[in-house]
């Protein structure tokens, strides 16, 4: 029997993960699929559809992967960790220190794990490896306004006519203003200098046809890491997110080296 995966969200990423689980030659199997609008699950057999996440333990999942919205971690994260390992892709939920502490404590008490997915972060392992040695870390995103969710911010994307810095400051602040866009920034902060010290910049540029992520890190010993990655976008997600998430799932199953 393969590792049982529960998937929350049946959009661009969720659909791709379901397909990969189904094509994994028995290495993985589906425990359940949940979507806020259950009508979207018309192509999923009813026995795999889970309407009420409060009943998640009945599906006996080994790993639950959230690929929908940070509110699922806020509302159900502790419930999930009481019965399974949990991997939230909407990492911005973990910018809440109190919530993160509760999730970590729940995992400790129940022998489960809270996984931090790699997401679109390039160089995350190098950042984690050096730990407290980083003196300064900065992460910059450049995206077309159409690929940024401005609903929690003060900006009207229709008024952005050229390259515009829509946020510059600590990662903790941007996580609240752009919760669907900056999961990788939160991951970067959590594995390096922390949510208040790690610097974030979000630049909206109508001239872009891709998303660009830049990470810069300066160590106390004078060493420097600089990475830059560009990728096509689908909605607010980069197209590489599917491969990255699948790799994180394989690692969580023990099939690949790494965390």
Residue spans for each PLM region:
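Glycine-rich adenosine-cofactor-binding loop
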Residues: 4-17
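Active-site-lining helix/loop region of Rossmann-like oxidoreductase modules
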Residues: 8, 115, 120-259
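NAD(P)-binding Rossmann-fold cofactor-contacting core
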Residues: 24-44
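Short, hydrophobic beta-strand segments that form beta-sheet elements in well-ordered domains
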Residues: 30-36, 49, 64-67
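Beta-loop-alpha module in the N-terminal Rossmann-like domain of NAD(P)-dependent dehydrogenases
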Residues: 53-55, 59-81, 93-97
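General beta-strand structural signal in soluble alpha/beta enzymes
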Residues: 66, 88, 114-118
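Rossmann-fold NAD(P)-binding glycine/threonine-rich loop
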Residues: 91-112
């Amino acid at each position: 029997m393969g590792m049982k995966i529960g998937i929350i969200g049946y959009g661009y990423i969720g659909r791709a993960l379901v397909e990969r689980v189904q094509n994994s030659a028995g290495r993985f199997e589906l425990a359940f699929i949940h979507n806020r609008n259950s009508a979207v699950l018309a192509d999923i057999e009813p026995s795999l559809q889970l309407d009420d996440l409060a009943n998640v333990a009945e599906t006996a999942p080994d790993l639950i992967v959230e690929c929908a919205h940070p509110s699922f971690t806020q509302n159900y994260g502790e419930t999930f960790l009481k019965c399974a390992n949990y991997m939230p892709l909407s990492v911005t939920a973990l910018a809440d220190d109190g919530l993160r502490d509760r999730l970590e404590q729940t995992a400790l008490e129940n022998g489960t794990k809270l996984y931090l997915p790699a997401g679109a972060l390039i160089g995350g392992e190098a950042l984690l490896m050096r730990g407290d040695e980083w003196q300064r870390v900065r992460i910059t995103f450049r995206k077309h306004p159409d690929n940024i969710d401005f609903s929690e911010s003060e900006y009207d994307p229709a008024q952005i006519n050229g390259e515009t810095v829509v946020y510059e400051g600590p990662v903790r602040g941007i996580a609240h203003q752009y919760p669907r866009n900056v999961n990788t920034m939160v991951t970067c902060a959590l594995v390096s200098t922390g949510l208040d010290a790690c610097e974030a910049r979000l630049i909206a540029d109508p001239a872009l046809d891709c998303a660009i992520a830049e990470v810069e890190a300066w160590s106390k010993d004078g060493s420097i890491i600089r990475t830059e990655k560009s990728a096509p976008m689908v909605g607010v997600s980069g197209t590489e997110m599917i491969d990255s998430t699948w790799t994180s799932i394989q690692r969580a199953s023990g099939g690949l080296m790494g965390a």
